[in-house]
Regions:
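Glycine-rich active-site loop/strand segments that organize a redox cofactor
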Residues: 76-124
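A glycine-rich dinucleotide-binding beta-alpha-beta segment and adjacent secondary-structure elements
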Residues: 156-159, 334-414
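Short hydrophobic core segments
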Residues: 34-36, 160, 180-195, 208, ...
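Core beta-strand elements of the Rossmann-like FAD/NAD(P) dinucleotide-binding domain
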Residues: 29-31, 175-184, 257-258
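Glycine-rich FAD pyrophosphate-binding loop
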Residues: 50-74
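An anion/pyrophosphate-binding glycine-rich loop and adjacent beta-alpha core
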Residues: 63-65, 70-71, 85-86, 121, ...
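A conserved short coil-to-beta-strand element within the FAD-binding core of flavoproteins
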Residues: 156-169
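N-terminal Rossmann-like FAD-binding beta1-loop-alpha1 element of flavoenzymes
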Residues: 32-58, 432-437
């Protein structure tokens, strides 16, 4: 049967284009790609490379793929944040602009469509955070695993030990049990946070073997330690809808300012806003940074003073220590009173205007001195990694070694909480896999 329309001869230019395409397709069919690490970035990279015709071997040292995905979002897996590209970039404080090509290739909207196209039901919650409808991270892992298998990828359990280089090109990976040769190698080993999931820094070792610079590692999205005794007395106290600022005491500048939830612990502070704040702290020298908490952000200073006056009037014959039942959580009363510096048994009707103003300022700027990060093993992600200037952002290929690619947490890019870090993994993995297949 003839096609509709007028038949014509192909032009010489069209014949050349078709010939080049056939050559590229034949080359892609025979191209071997080795992906090291079967986390979020590795699974996406492997499937992308396979979809573009490469023969893919995915190396994972754990018995099961996606171990770290399983614990993200408190076991629910915050798949991504369904925001626009510019919003995404603003939520990546470390080398966000490096990700423009990757995120435009696979946007958050594309990510949602990708998973739903594989049959995974998703839902969007507050702050555009996307989760599986089942609230089970295992469903995300199983969906990806089945997709990778259906794409024809070979998954092997082995531990990468050495990157094989020849004439300035990556030609394979020597593992504990076997050597795997390839035309392209993609390193997706993750960082050093949560080492029990297999993230033990193997990718940095392989990158160094290729001559890459590793930006010093530090924990990010991590709880903060404090030597303030108040924190220990308030451990377990969760504060919702509070303001949190991180102030650099050396420069006087506010490096972080947000609103949300936090938690006092025996070592200091944790919770969503605290984890995000940790991304903004660079030199964690003891005492350099203070956390300044606005306990009543919905009230202005004037409104809060009036509220205090009303409470004291209602409890005029009571001790001030018994007048905060409506204003503050029980665990916060004693620390506030101690800082306020007046006798606990002082009567409400004897509180002066100046004392009331001092209390107001204390509640609007409850300050906790930060002494350090919790260990990197407790961090959600690792800050630092392979220097971005040594990676081509349009392909994720090494600028130092041909045929070597990077994706995910091993790169010096990290973002805030809310699904942004997994999006980095999906987008860089997708771009690296596609590029490696060509």
């Amino acid at each position: 049967m003839k096609p509709y329309g007028t038949e014509r001869e192909f032009t010489q230019a069209e014949r050349r284009t078709r010939k080049k395409r056939r050559k590229r397709e034949r080359r892609m069919e025979s191209k071997k790609v080795v992906v090291v690490g079967a986390g979020a970035a590795g699974l996406m990279a492997a499937s992308a490379a396979a979809m573009y015709g490469a023969s893919v071997t995915l190396i994972e040292k754990n018995k099961r793929v996606g171990r770290k995905i399983m614990i993200t979002g408190k076991g629910r897996c915050n798949v991504c944040n369904n925001c626009d590209v510019e919003t995404f970039i603003r939520n990546v404080p470390t080398n966000g602009k490096f990700l423009y090509s990757a995120i435009n290739k696979l946007t958050p909207e594309d990510t949602v469509a990708f998973f739903e196209g594989l049959g995974l039901s998703l839902k969007t919650e507050r702050g555009n955070r996307v989760f599986p409808q089942s609230d089970k991270a295992v469903d995300v892992v199983d969906t990806l695993y089945n997709y990778v298998k259906n794409c024809g990828c070979k998954i092997v359990e082995d531990t990468a030990e050495e990157l094989l280089l020849e004439n300035g090109e990556a030609v394979g990976v020597k593992c504990k049990n076997k050597t795997y040769y390839a035309d392209s190698v993609i390193i997706c080993c993750g960082g050093k946070s949560y080492p029990l999931t297999g993230s033990t820094g193997d990718g940095y070792t392989l990158a160094k073997q290729a001559g890459h610079t590793i930006v010093p590692l530090k924990p990010s999205l991590v709880p903060l330690e404090s030597k303030n005794l108040d924190c220990k007395s308030m451990q377990g106290l969760a504060l919702k809808n509070v303001g949190l600022k991180i102030v650099d005491t050396q420069s006087g500048k506010t490096v972080y300012d947000d609103f949300g939830e936090m938690l006092f612990t025996h070592f200091g502070m944790s919770g969503p806003t605290v984890l995000s704040a940790s991304s903004h702290i660079r030199d964690i020298s003891d005492g350099r940074y203070n956390a300044v908490i606005d306990i009543k952000p919905a009230l202005s200073h004037e409104q809060l003073e009036k509220r205090l006056q009303r409470d004291f009037d209602e409890n005029h014959n009571k001790d001030v220590s018994n007048s905060f039942t409506k204003l503050l959580p029980k665990k916060l009363v004693v620390p506030v009173l101690k800082r306020w510096g007046i006798p606990f048994d002082k009567k409400c009707n004897s509180v002066t205007k100046e004392e009331r103003r001092t209390l107001c300022e204390l509640l609007k700027a409850f300050t906790v001195e930060i002494s350090g990060f919790r260990p990197i093993e407790e961090a959600i992600i690792t800050s630092g990694g392979v220097k971005t200037t040594e990676i081509n952002p349009k392909t994720m290929e090494s600028r130092l070694v041909k045929g070597l690619y990077f994706a995910g947490e091993v790169i010096d890019c990290d973002a805030y909480t809310g699904g942004f870090n997994l999006q980095i993994a999906w987008s860089t993995g997708n771009l690296a896999g596609e590029s490696a297949a060509y």
